[in-house]
Amino acid sequence: MRKDRQNKITEVGIYLKDLQNRLCRAFEKEEGESRFQETLWEKPNGGGGRTRLLTEGHVIEQGGVNFSCVYGNQLPPAATQKHPEISGFAFQAEGLSLVIHPRNPYVPTVHANFRFFIAGKDEADPRWWFGGGYDLTPYYGFEEDCRHWHRVAKKACDRFGEAIYPRFKAACDDYFYLKHRNEPRGIGGLFFDDLNEWEFKRCFEFIKILGDSFLEAYLPIMQNRKNHPYGERQREFQLYRRGRYVEFNLLYDRGTRFGLEFGGRTESILMSLPPRVVWRPNWEPEPGSEEARLYEDYLVRRNWVSVSGA
């Protein structure tokens, strides 16, 4: 059983590191000259990771694509919130986390995460599961972008059954929600936890299909919007809306909590935060403006796959 457990860890790690390489190459191609800077880190008796960060780029103001492989004698509370029966279990976990904060306000911020856990009190019967997904946070909405994003996500999910996309889409809408603001973080995507309902091979295949679909979902949006003209008004609104991103990640995000509770590398964990942000107390958008449309037409639950258009 120990060999089988290690084989799973090795197999998932190989894929996630390869995906990290492919994602970084794709974003560097969009940038032209800027490159991700790599930092290797280790936690004594706890694993380590490979952090890649791109800052002050032409297209990407700040973006991180991180891989980590960690282990410990006890799962942090963030990993056992829904399943207290496994608290106290020794564990191994691998994950890839991506957050891109573009410079142009018309390019949405994007987040993706793919992770694998294996835990148990002994080697005889370890419990394993996958989690992750991806979600999109626009500042200025375009229906064709939202439709494309969700259709790619649905196409990836449909290979595993037509019930998968609506289930994980709804979970994403539920998870990325700021309760204290009574609004979603963005237009959603896919989110899932505790995926082990199929055999390991099929669950892992789902992760790979989803990971491989990410660039198809996001790059065309970035390419179409990165040269869109904008001014100070759009930039200020982008910085204001980034505040919601900060609030969610620090108040609600379980991945952030897991990393901090585990004692991982803080700089890598907080790479999800934007480099610049503003808060404006009691600010409201001008009625009928592009900014108001974000709240009225995009920060609402919608069946984006069925939105009319070519």
Swiss-Prot record:
Cofactors that this protein relies on: a divalent metal cation
Class of the enzyme per the UniProt entry, highest EC level: oxidoreductase
Binding site for substrate: 97, 113-115, 263-265
Site label Important for dimerization, positions: 180
TM region(s), chain numbering: none
A GO cellular component entry from the record: cytoplasm
GO MF term (any one): metal ion binding
Key word Phosphoprotein present: no
Top-level taxonomic group: Bacteria
EC number: 1.3.3.3
Binding site for a divalent metal cation: 101, 111, 150, 180
Reaction catalyzed: coproporphyrinogen III + O2 + 2 H(+) = protoporphyrinogen IX + 2 CO2 + 2 H2O
Location(s) in or outside the cell: Cytoplasm
InterPro entries hit by this protein: Coprogen_oxidase_aer, Coprogen_oxidase_aer_sf, Coprogen_oxidase_CS
Broad class of where this protein is predominantly found: cytoplasm
Annotated region (Important for dimerization), positions in chain: 245-280
Residues annotated as catalytic: 111 (proton donor)
Cytoplasm as UniProt keyword: yes
GO BP annotation list: protoporphyrinogen IX biosynthetic process
Alphabetical UniProt keywords: Cytoplasm, Heme biosynthesis, Metal-binding, Oxidoreductase, Porphyrin biosynthesis
Family in the record: Belongs to the aerobic coproporphyrinogen-III oxidase family.
Protein purpose: Involved in the heme biosynthesis. Catalyzes the aerobic oxidative decarboxylation of propionate groups of rings A and B of coproporphyrinogen-III to yield the vinyl groups in protoporphyrinogen-IX.
Oligomer and partners: Homodimer.
Protein name: Oxygen-dependent coproporphyrinogen-III oxidase
Organism listed in the record: Coxiella burnetii (strain RSA 493 / Nine Mile phase I)
Annotated gene: hemF
